[in-house]
């Protein structure tokens, strides 16, 4: 067995698990949200969008838009089109605590969340300064830089720039220093308790670092961040979700557990998440081994087919499951990565639907493995039932040569002609199905 074959065998489990780890592996569910199909020699992995309505037609429409985080660019274009039909889109993104807004029931809670938001924005300002050798001149410049790096941060940035009382944070930059300011509950300078002015300056540590590693005026620090999922996507010849979708859109809102909350819950319970640890340690042994194996199977159709079958099989097994443990996850990972993060999404959905004027339609845009739990909650809590489904092809690999594809096209065209000649009146249903196959086959002709 050659090295590439050994690598493919070694990745049979871990590669498909890596793709699912972002969304938390499989979920117990009545409806499948992932599947693999082989049609005319073409192996495809697909994810589902399911629309939920009350049987009497009243109330909200909620769509569960399942996604896999690596796929063809055309797949993500299709997903964006589906999401465009909903008034509000709730998307997953584990971010710092201050990225989810400053809403609170009391002034004390608003103050604490405003402090979290200011810390989050300052961390983005630190990233700007490290990359550019100077502070951002304005919040607008900081936003443009941040969103250019990751569009998922567009809405979190906007949320964090508004304090708990609905006023925009102040920002001043001069002489290499900067500070963020909230005037507190009373909106006026001075005050105490909840009316206390909140002022968050540039970190002194960063000032020292900047002087020690001062950049020339036009020099920029290279971005050396590594992404295991990008390397996985490159090995499969597909794209990353986060780099294929522009999240800076009206109505797109982050809905997830803050990273600090995930870690705090684990610490309080004395637990460890092997999945979170692997993903957070870029220089760890597990990631290093995965990178080594991926380098050996890059652009391998055999490897891509294996991953498609593994992902589809996981989704179909989840759809059949009616209870018990979720395959591939330990008890801790199952609870923290799926259950508790899903609870945060449902809380945000409940807030939206509880408004005096709720949105007419909401999409939950999450890893397909989360959807079974969401579906059960929609049914039990809001009486919503699945009304329609659309399957989208995330990636595929062709087993057939161009010659064989052309031969199948000719055979189907001949069959359609014979059906039409024999029974013109009843030919439509059969010919319509064959026409769809023809359309897919013609796309594969080189």
Question: Can you annotate each of these PLM segments?
Answer:
Residues 23-92:
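Zymogen propeptides
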Residues 72-75, 97-103, 191, 371-375:
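Extracytoplasmic/secreted cell-surface and envelope-processing proteins
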Residues 58-69, 99-105, 327-332:
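Acidic/histidine-rich, surface-exposed loop or edge segments in extracytoplasmic proteins
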Residues 7-16:
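Bacterial N-terminal signal peptides
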Residues 23-29, 38-41, 101-102, 203-361, ...:
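Hydrophobic, often amphipathic alpha-helical segments used for membrane interaction and targeting
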Residues 1-7:
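Bacterial N-terminal signal peptides that target proteins for export
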Residues 111-213:
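Low-complexity, acidic interaction segments enriched in glycine
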Residues 46-54, 167-172, 179, 350-351:
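Short, surface-exposed beta-strand/loop micro-motifs that present aromatic residues
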């Amino acid at each position: 067995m050659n090295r590439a074959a050994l690598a493919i065998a070694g990745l049979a489990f871990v590669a498909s698990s890596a793709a699912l780890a972002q969304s938390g592996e499989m979920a117990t569910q009545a409806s499948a949200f992932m599947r693999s199909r082989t049609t005319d020699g073409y192996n495809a992995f697909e994810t589902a969008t399911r629309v939920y309505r009350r049987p009497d037609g009243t109330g909200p429409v909620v769509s569960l838009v399942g996604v896999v985080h690596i796929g063809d660019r055309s797949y993500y274009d299709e997903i964006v089109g589906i999401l465009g039909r909903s008034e509000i889109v709730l998307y997953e993104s584990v971010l710092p605590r201050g990225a989810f807004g400053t809403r609170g029931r009391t002034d004390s809670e608003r103050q604490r969340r405003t402090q979290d938001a200011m810390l989050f924005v300052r961390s983005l300002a630190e990233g700007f300064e490290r990359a550019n050798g100077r502070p951002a001149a304005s919040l607008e410049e900081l936003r443009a830089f941040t969103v250019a790096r990751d569009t998922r941060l567009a809405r979190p940035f906007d949320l964090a720039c508004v304090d708990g009382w609905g006023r925009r944070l102040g920002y001043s930059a001069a002489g290499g220093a900067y500070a963020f300011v909230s005037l507190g509950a009373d909106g006026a300078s001075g005050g105490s308790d909840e009316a206390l002015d909140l002022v968050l300056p540039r970190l002194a540590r960063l000032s020292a670092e900047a002087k020690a590693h001062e950049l020339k005026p036009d020099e920029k620090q290279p971005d050396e961040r590594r992404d295991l999922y990008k390397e996985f996507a490159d090995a499969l010849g597909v794209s990353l979700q986060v780099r294929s979708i522009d999240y800076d859109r009206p109505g797109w809102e982050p809905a997830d557990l803050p990273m600090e909350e995930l870690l705090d819950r684990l610490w309080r319970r004395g637990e460890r998440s092997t999945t979170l640890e692997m993903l957070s340690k870029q220089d760890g042994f597990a990631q290093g081994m995965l990178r080594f194996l991926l380098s050996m199977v890059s652009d391998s159709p055999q490897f891509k087919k294996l991953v498609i079958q593994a992902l589809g099989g996981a989704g179909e097994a989840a759809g059949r499951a009616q209870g018990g443990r979720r395959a591939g996850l330990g008890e801790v990972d199952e609870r923290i990565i799926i259950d508790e993060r899903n609870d945060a999404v449902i809380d945000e959905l409940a807030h939206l639907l509880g408004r005096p004027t709720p949105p007419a339609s909401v999409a939950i845009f999450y890893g397909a493995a989360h959807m079974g739990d969401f579906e059960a909650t929609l049914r039990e809590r809001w009486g919503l039932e699945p009304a329609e489904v659309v399957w989208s092809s995330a990636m595929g690999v062709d087993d057939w040569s161009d010659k064989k594809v052309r031969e199948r096209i000719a055979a189907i065209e001949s069959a359609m002609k014979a059906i039409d000649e024999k029974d013109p009146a009843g030919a439509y249903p059969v010919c319509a199905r064959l026409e769809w196959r023809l359309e897919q086959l013609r796309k594969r002709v080189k």
